UniProtKB/Swiss-Prot annotation:
This is UDP-4-amino-4-deoxy-L-arabinose--oxoglutarate aminotransferase. Belongs to the DegT/DnrJ/EryC1 family. ArnB subfamily. GO terms for biological process: lipid A biosynthetic process; lipopolysaccharide biosynthetic process; response to antibiotic. GO terms for molecular function: pyridoxal phosphate binding; UDP-4-amino-4-deoxy-L-arabinose aminotransferase. GO terms for cellular component: membrane. Its EC number is 2.6.1.87. Pfam families: DegT_DnrJ_EryC1. It comes from Pseudomonas aeruginosa (strain UCBPP-PA14).
């Protein structure tokens, strides 16, 4: 009997999400409005942060955040190469230069020491990445950023629901979360900027909507003058209420969704123990892991086949997988500009990373199916 294809990720959408979106569709106001405002309020309350601004994507959020910080031509921004390439793209599109640093071989996160070694006279910001639901050593990074007077913007795209030393990621400083379709909290496409910097938050809010001081809902629904003034040129990165309504329901479910992810991840760790798969290591500090991804490292010498062949073998058995990520400096555009850059840990992992299925609606027997498939693949190579 053939089994249905098991994707590496699938959003957990229930009747409450469908009803919430339907309510917005019937309300007569489907773009940025009251649901967007409620989402910002609820998200800030959950984290305990001062400001939350909803946007249409984490890429857009990073764009306007760096712009609001004054990043531009001649500046440098330090970021790990082993992350989604949108970070490097945004830095480059602002006219600045991404300065790539290597990551720890096992946690895939950059250290304060690596970041400080990369700081130069033109460094204006640091964009480190919480990886796969695990958390950065923020204290060290905050110390380095403060010592050099450099902005720190946490890429928390993987970390909604994660905690660092007992506090939610994003409760202090500035961070950006993603609500993309595969994330722990999804609204199809969306993001949240959070910060305790009032001036920065105000400018991000303005830049996300054409540089206007108010949005369309404020102007048309609250009786304010229909033509607001442009304070500065901005962009169109606002989040529609259709998306915000979906995110609000997901936010209420987040603890349960993440608890299920953790249970599945723990089952994987138990079931795959003893196999030469090298799952990611965990940092030494106290944390709550959000388990956005479950990542293996497939080394040809240890496993008898390389990562790409392993993924093809999973696919042949009806199981999806993903790569998170190919290091940014290995992409054609950046390789052309920094041909001599060597980041050994990022490069080693780029050739071996494989994300296997992990999402809340998986059944326990799905874990068993994946584990047996992996055992079968490895056994055939011995």
């Amino acid at each position: 009997m053939s089994l249905d294809f098991l994707p590496f990720s699938r959003p957990s959408i229930g009747e409450d999400e469908i009803a919430a979106v339907e309510q917005v569709l019937r309300s007569g106001w489907i773009t940025t409005g009251p649901k967007n405002q409620e989402l910002e309020q609820r998200f800030a309350e959950r984290l305990g942060c001062r400001h939350a601004v909803a946007l249409s994507s984490a890429t857009g959020a990073l764009h306007v955040t760096l712009l609001a910080l004054g990043i531009g031509p001649g500046d440098e921004v330090i970021t790990p190469s082993l992350t989604w390439v949108s970070t490097a793209n945004v830095i480059t599109l602002l006219g600045a230069t991404p300065v790539f640093v290597d990551v720890d071989r096992d946690t895939l996160m950059c250290s304060a020491q690596a970041v400080e070694a990369a700081i130069g006279p033109r460094t204006r910001a640091i964009v480190p990445v919480h990886y796969a639901g695990s958390t950065l050593d923020l204290e060290g990074l905050r110390t380095v950023a403060g010592r050099h007077g450099i902005a720190l913007v946490e890429d928390a795209a993987h970390a909604v629901g994660s905690e660092y030393r007992g506090r939610p990621v994003g409760s202090r400083g500035t961070a950006i979360f993603s609500f993309h379709a595969i994330k722990n909290l999804t609204c199809a496409e969306g993001a949240m900027f959070v910060s305790d910097d009032s001036a920065l938050a105000e400018r991000v809010r303005r830049l996300k909507f054409h540089g206007l001081g108010v949005d369309a809902y404020d102007r048309l629904s609250h009786g304010r003058k229909p033509q607001a003034e442009v304070i500065e040129p901005g962009f169109k990165y606002n989040l529609a209420d259709l998306n915000a309504a979906l995110a609000l329901v997901q936010l209420k479910r987040l603890d349960a969704l993440n608890a299920r992810r953790q249970a599945l991840a723990e089952r994987y760790l138990e079931r795959l123990a003893g196999l030469p798969l090298a799952p990611l290591g965990l940092p030494a500090h106290k944390q709550r892991h959000a388990w956005h991804l479950f990542i293996l490292r497939i080394d040809a010498e240890a496993c008898g086949l390389g990562r790409d062949a392993f993924m093809e073998a999973l696919k042949a058995r009806g199981i999806g997988s993903g790569i998170h990520f190919i290091a940014s400096h290995l992409h054609h555009y950046y390789r052309q500009r920094q041909p001599r850059l060597s980041l050994p840990n990022s490069e080693w992992n780029s050739a071996r990373l494989c994300s296997i299925p992990l999402f809340p609606d998986m059944r326990d027997d799905d874990i068993e199916r994946v584990a047996r498939a992996i055992e079968d693949i490895l056994e055939k190579r011995r």
